[in-house]
From Swiss-Prot:
PROSITE patterns: RIBOSOMAL_S16 (PS00732)
Entries under InterPro entries matching the protein: Ribosomal_bS16, Ribosomal_bS16_CS, Ribosomal_bS16_dom_sf
Family per record: Belongs to the bacterial ribosomal protein bS16 family.
Protein name: Small ribosomal subunit protein bS16
Cellular component per GO, a single term: small ribosomal subunit
Keyword match Phosphoprotein: no
Species in which this protein is naturally found: Photorhabdus laumondii subsp. laumondii (strain DSM 15139 / CIP 105565 / TT01)
Gene3D superfamilies according to UniProt: 3.30.1320.10
């Protein structure tokens, strides 16, 4: 099953997340099919906190991909701003 979820990156105590399309059986930070955005929870100043490719996300959802709870919240936030 294909899922859209967060993959953690960044340094210790400074998380940075990639929004990725991946097989649900792969590890959290492992192999992925496509990167569709990023989320920086500790962005300050003019730093961009969230960027999502909504067209590609809708494409994958149309193909049957499931979306994690946190990513669905981020999608709603991105649609408010857009």
């Amino acid at each position: 099953m294909v899922t859209i979820r967060l993959a953690r990156g960044g340094a210790k105590k400074r998380p940075f997340y990639q929004v990725v399309v991946t097989d649900s059986r792969s590890p959290r930070d492992g192999r992925f099919i496509e990167r569709v955005g990023f989320f920086n929870p500790i962005a300050t100043g003019k730093a961009e906190a969230l960027r999502l490719d909504l067209d590609r996300i809708e494409h994958w959802i149309g193909l049957g991909a499931t979306v994690s709870d946190r990513v669905s919240t981020l999608i709603k936030d991105a649609k408010k701003v857009a």
